[in-house]
Amino acid sequence: MLTKNLLLCFAAAKAALAVPHDSVAQRSDALHMLSERSTPSSTGENNGFYYSFWTDGGGDVTYTNGDAGAYTVEWSNVGNFVGGKGWNPGSAQDITYSGTFTPSGNGYLSVYGWTTDPLIEYYIVESYGDYNPGSGGTYKGTVTSDGSVYDIYTATRTNAASIQGTATFTQYWSVRQNKRVGGTVTTSNHFNAWAKLGMNLGTHNYQIVATEGYQSSGSSSITVQ
């Protein structure tokens, strides 16, 4: 993430130097407006919940924390972002949420989290846009939970952004066949099914009900209970 942001800043500075002197001020104002229209990456506590928001800086995305476990996201022509509310650390808990999720293109609504030792990024996908996120991984099996069958996948990310900086790590995916926005996710059912397939989690880091967008537009309004 840091490297990409530095490259973007370098590219902007190079472009500014390439224009006539009388256009520099105008370009500077335009770049300032561009940087201000998207929410910067951040984490923390908000109204009794942990929140995490990360963006690669591409496109226009606005993340807003609301009361208690509520948040909204609006995005347009983004690169990649993921954000939401939940807990730090996470656990094998029942998670109830409600709201709306309307992606145009590639987006996911999921229980999303990380563990360490091993470093694992995991998704329990409740709904998605026009791309099934598991299709790029290795199919492992299924688990039935909360009124639907979920397909289980693994994938490996190499030299990618993680909670420990740039790293190589494994992703675990449960992707719901019958999409929904709202209900209770029994995370222990997924964690146990993964373990039976040799997909072991480590020590829980954060765990949120997340909206993610990738090269897409859309909006989301979610409340975690």
From Swiss-Prot:
Regulation: Metal ions, copper, iron and N-bromosuccinimide decrease enzyme activity. Manganese, calcium, L-tryptophan, beta-mercaptoethanol, L-cysteine and dithiodipyridine stimulate the enzyme activity.
InterPro entries hit by this protein: ConA-like_dom_sf, GH11/12, GH11_AS_1, GH11_AS_2, GH11_dom, Glyco_hydro_11
Domain GH11: 37-225
GO molecular function: endo-1,4-beta-xylanase activity
Protein name: Endo-1,4-beta-xylanase B
Active-site residues, record numbering mapped to chain: 121, 212
Lineage top rank: taxon: Eukaryota
